[in-house]
Amino acid sequence: MTKTFKKFSIAGLALLFMATAAFAGWSTKASAADMRSLTAAQITAEMGAGWNLGNQLEATVNGTPNETSWGNPTITPELIKKVKAAGFKTIRIPVSYLNYIGSAPNYTVNASWLNRIQQVVDYAYNEGLYVVINMHGDGFHSIPGSWLHVNSSNQNVIRDKYQKVWQQVATRFSAYNERLIFESMNEVFDGNYNNPNTSYYGNLNAYNQIFVDTVRKTGGNNNARWLLVPGWNTNIDYTVGNYGFVVPTDNFRSSAIPSSQKRIMISAHYYSPWDFAGEENGNITQWGATATNPAKRSTWGQEDYLDSQFKSMYDKFVTQGYPVVMGEFGSIDKSSYDSSNNNYRAVYAKAVTATAKKYKLVPVYWDNGFNGQHGFALFNRFNNTVTQQNIINAIMQGMQ
């Protein structure tokens, strides 16, 4: 997601390279012996409620990733420890590559950037958390240097580049166990919000298939790793409906996996109703049956809609053995317009997580690190403190 962020003119690329210079040669002690073969139900239960380390490793300056360029400080182990202590079991780490990808034909990813990604992964992985890493801003039309475009005429070049980048990333992490999950992409679509173009959707499906095949062929634990793939723009309706989504085949996975079990997960995001969750104004500040002011409550997207959306993912995928990860959900702070807003944000968060648990989905809260008006943050990343304990409590209550 890049819908809500604040950019500040602070630490530049020189600072990033100073920070990452010490990470060269960073390695992990993970081994193939660590890999557990979990069923869909088991891994969903273990992943619990998740949290996004948003607007950091996907943040960019003119197409070059820079983790502090959107106003957040350098990521520290202390932040991750605080997130774990709050009760979260999974951390999703959005990652952009963009200008850190070299030229054809090798498309070599900058080594210092890979080292930094690995170090941040290890902050969470070494705490016993589940970790999800993806390819995030590379597919956003609005990001300078983005290239993973379903509506581009240059699909052969895109697919070759995509395959080679994921090959490098997967190889780097091939020894990590089942607690590391790769996600093929983020909110990829053609840039307009009409129904999906069938041809473009076919390109998205091709990316997902390339991703699965490439990761599996890198060996190590990757032939049995859980892999996460989205449909069009991570939209639930466009993923479950008759719009063209195809679950990738998994022909190169380990033969040790029981044939009745899957190792593919499906990704979707939930920000409905958007006028409550994301619009940066004070028009809609309340949500749900307990709203006290009908004029401040959206005319759609309430409890019944939430239930029907998550049930559709359950019916389409969970019943067939595919875990579903709601990789982003949340609502921005509008308390400057309505002092009761944070209470309704908590009501919303609890409803989303409780409904996810009801339908055996994994809910992952979107935190962009920004506190205050229009921010999604639950934590202050500068001093590693909790800023929205009521929303965290609501999330954890929803998972009970």
Curated annotation (Swiss-Prot):
Activity regulation reads:
Strongly inhibited by Hg(2+), Ag(+) and Fe(3+). To a lesser extent, is also inhibited by Pb(2+), Mn(2+), Sn(2+) and Cu(2+). By contrast, Ni(2+), Zn(2+), Co(2+), Ba(2+) and NH(4)(+) do not affect enzyme activity, while 10 mM Ca(2+), and Mg(2+) produce a stimulating effect. Is also strongly inhibited by chemicals such as N-bromosuccinimide and dimethyl(2-dihydroxy-5-nitrobenzyl)sulphonium bromide. Is not affected by N-acetylimidazole.
What Enzyme Commission number does this protein have?
3.2.1.4
Q: Fetch the PROSITE patterns from UniProt.
A: GLYCOSYL_HYDROL_F5
- Keywords from the named record: Carbohydrate metabolism, Cellulose degradation, Glycosidase, Hydrolase, Polysaccharide degradation, Secreted, Signal
Q: How is it used?
A: Study of the performance of endoglucanase A on paper manufacture from agricultural fibers shows that treatment with the enzyme improves the properties of the pulp and the quality of paper. CelA treatment enhances the physical properties (stretch and tensile index) of paper from wheat straw, while dewatering properties are slightly diminished.
Q: Which residues form the signal peptide?
A: 1-32
Q: Which PANTHER family match?
A: ENDOGLUCANASE, PUTATIVE (AFU_ORTHOLOGUE AFUA_5G01830)-RELATED (PTHR31297:SF41), GLUCAN ENDO-1,6-BETA-GLUCOSIDASE B (PTHR31297)
Tell me the protein's name. Answer: Endoglucanase A
According to the entry, what is the taxonomic lineage of the organism? Bacteria, Bacillati, Bacillota, Bacilli, Bacillales
Its gene?
celA
